[in-house]
Regions:
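Long, hydrophobic/aromatic-enriched structural stretches that serve as scaffold segments
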Residues: 1-17
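Extended ligand-binding clefts on enzyme/binding-domain cores
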Residues: 15-232
């Protein structure tokens, strides 16, 4: 919705849906930050993504790396920062929305960094150490019928989430998305293949998906960058 609004915001004659959609996008962003994230002071200054409004969180409540989308949070943050306050028919849930979005972005980056080696699992658990750094929490967690430690149908989405961040915010990619994706791309460039031993079972069903997803990262970044240029140049 935000991209659709941005695509036409400079048009002299805007579509009939323009105001309705941008108000809905703003309200949806506020609802997401309110109901789909956790702010628990016992885990330091982190705002953690949940797996929906009713599950997911710290420790045994579980995490899924592919749910984290820092680029989407930046998009919502910036959209809300520029949204006309007079058009809102509700009270914002936080006095400083930008700060709360930035906390969520930083926490998601920390979660993604923890899980990467450089691939990520379908599911996992996280907590914080004595210095409030995000670390792993031992134990099992899974959902959707996919194994916890497999780079499978859940985990493969993580690449696209991070690539979206790099494409939408290229000036910020050096701090997170570029080094994150570089490890994955480097493995493929070096002809990485899983050992044909005990770990093969975790790759057999997803080899095509794995190689396709990773090898297409650069192409997807180019495509999204082009889309961004088109959106910002429309008048």
């Amino acid at each position: 919705m935000i991209l659709a609004v941005q695509a036409v915001e400079n048009w002299n004659e805007k579509p009939s849906w323009y105001d309705e959609v941008r108000k809905f996008a703003d309200a949806s962003s506020s609802a997401f930050l309110t109901f789909n994230t956790l702010d628990d002071s016992s885990y330091g200054d982190h705002r953690l993504l949940k797996l929906g409004s009713c599950w997911g969180g710290w420790k045994g409540n579980g995490q899924n790396p592919s749910y984290h989308s820092p680029g989407s949070y930046k998009l919502m943050r910036d959209f809300q920062a520029s949204f006309p306050a007079g058009m809102r028919t509700y009270t914002l849930p936080f006095s400083d929305m930008t700060t709360e979005w930035n906390r969520l972005i930083a926490t998601s980056n920390g979660v993604l960094n923890h899980f990467q080696c450089p691939l990520v699992p379908n599911w996992g658990r996280v907590t914080v150490d004595g210095n409030d750094n995000i670390v792993g929490d031992s134990g099992s967690f899974s959902g959707s019928g996919t194994p916890q430690y497999e780079f499978g149908s859940e985990a493969s989405r993580t690449i696209w989430r991070v690539a979206f961040d790099a494409a939408m915010y290229p000036s910020e990619m050096d701090s997170f998305s570029k080094p994150y994706l570089s490890g994955i791309i480097s493995q493929l460039d070096n002809g990485y293949a899983p050992d044909a031993g005990v770990n093969l079972k975790f790759f057999e069903g997803d080899t095509v998906s794995l190689r396709f997803s990773c090898s297409m990262v650069l192409d997807s970044m180019d495509l999204l960058s082009l889309s961004r240029r088109v959106l910002t140049s429309r008048s």
